């Protein structure tokens, strides 16, 4: 339709842009993401028949010829697979990513970002011995894959992955104690703002959970409902919660004045009107709700990092020794 409109108005024809959406674990909170844009696919005049242009000019619509649709589909099918995990199973996907980490580790490097990991894993996948690109992808086999798969599953069983590996000579990386002050500050701020977080974000999370549980259309649909609750919940829920907080301030303003040593008329804010003070309180609720959400995310990151650091330190010795041998064999 866009191409027909452009041709009808003597404008340049649009291009189709393949997009790769890469999520580490799409269903998890605070997961890593990398959005990749491929080379645009130009649309030519011969792909937009004159009858389509005439129909669009008349405010109507006709379907494009099947051969043009198939031509564009085939072009997309050629370009899109390399921008996906292109793995037969998730276990294979994990094995390839771990191999990318192992190779970087052997070279004295680390894959610091999800984008670096995705691109490095793609190089490993494309260069895998005996692999033939196909659609759908054929499973990777061989002794090297067996070692990579076993190593990846050892980590996966305990919630770890290639990011937890240490430099060559040490299986796991150590916790970065330089982050301890900021971690403590993040948790302290989260606890301070916890009442606001529970009353605002807590209701949004509950709404997302209820909407997600109400669908039987699979994990993607569940995540979509949760996204809608997160996106629109602040528009629907926060104004009501802010009004309740403002009412609470009004009913307890004498107690608050005594607690903080303020004057009894502190809500008038020097203008002689309590309504002004209540309006300011109401408006201040929104940035506080936002800050409570940011503090929750920061505290969540601290929890996840601390949990993984504990898991690394308590990793069974036998499995750790086996993992080290597998990693050495992967890059030997």
Where are these regions (language model features)?
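Short, well-ordered amphipathic alpha-helices
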Residues: 1-7
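Membrane-interfacial terminal anchoring regions of lipid-handling membrane enzymes
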Residues: 7-332
